[in-house]
A protein has these predicted regions:
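Alpha-helical transmembrane bundles and membrane-interface segments of multipass inner-membrane proteins
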Residues: 1-237
């Protein structure tokens, strides 16, 4: 039995009320904070574990020493084969650049950029998303986690701790090489924070591309219906 009520809430102007902004929603904030905290914790824990266990001895990082030598590296070590067929190794690297080692020796710029990006992401979450845009909130939280995880390393150690090396023993065919001279299929070493950043961006791009059309107001719907009826009447006449 129908109650006769409309399933939508209407504003005084006849506009069908949309999802409220995310900043008004406790659920949205909880999603953002919980996912971000989990991601940051996972990233920092994985880095700590790797630098304590991958080499023969725990690698102690001295911030002043690393800042004084832009080519500072952990002591030589064999690394750990994680997946067979040379798919993944754990190999310790200190990255003075951005994601996958891009832009070396620009520490201050990356710190300022990361702080700006984190602030912008929070603003976009608060006023640029709706309360029920849960997937977007997860994507933004993953970006925050990745950015903050690497920012922590830049401030505390002077560089970012990386240890994930995909396809370490796979070479490019036909003696090809990358601009830096590397012949590996994937010569970059990365970390969990980098993965979180890329996953977050992928979620946001996907959700933005599949976003539904906004709900129309009662007035615009009524005007469309009137135009359709007028067209039918003209055809019938």
């Amino acid at each position: 039995m129908s109650s006769g009520r409309s399933p939508h809430t209407h504003s005084p102007t006849g506009q069908v009320s949309a999802d409220p902004p995310a900043w008004t929603s406790p659920v949205a904030w909880c999603t953002l904070v919980l996912v971000a905290v989990f991601g940051i914790g996972l990233d920092l824990w994985s880095k700590d574990w790797a630098f304590e266990n991958v080499a023969e001895r725990p690698v102690v990082l001295d911030r002043d020493e690393i800042l004084a030598d832009s080519d500072w590296r952990p002591p030589p070590h064999e690394g750990i084969e994680v997946l067979p067929f040379g798919l993944l190794d754990f190999d310790l690297v200190m990255n003075h650049g951005a994601v996958f080692g891009i832009g070396q020796d620009q520490r201050t710029i990356f710190i300022v950029f990361t702080i700006t990006a984190v602030t912008l992401a929070l603003v976009i979450f608060a006023v640029g998303t709706r309360a029920r845009s849960h997937a977007l909130h997860v994507g933004i939280a993953l970006i925050l986690a990745g950015g903050i995880g690497n920012l922590y390393d830049r401030i505390l150690f002077g560089a970012v701790r990386d240890f994930l090396h995909m396809l370490p023993r796979w070479d490019l065919p036909f003696s090809m090489n990358w601009p830096n001279g590397s012949t590996g299929v994937f010569p970059w070493v990365f970390n969990v924070a980098d993965m979180l950043l890329l996953l977050g961006m992928a979620i946001i791009v996907f959700m933005t591309g599949t976003r539904k059309e906004p709900v129309q107001s009662d007035d615009s719907i009524s005007q469309k219906n009137d135009r359709i009826l007028d067209s039918k009447n003209e055809l019938g006449g």
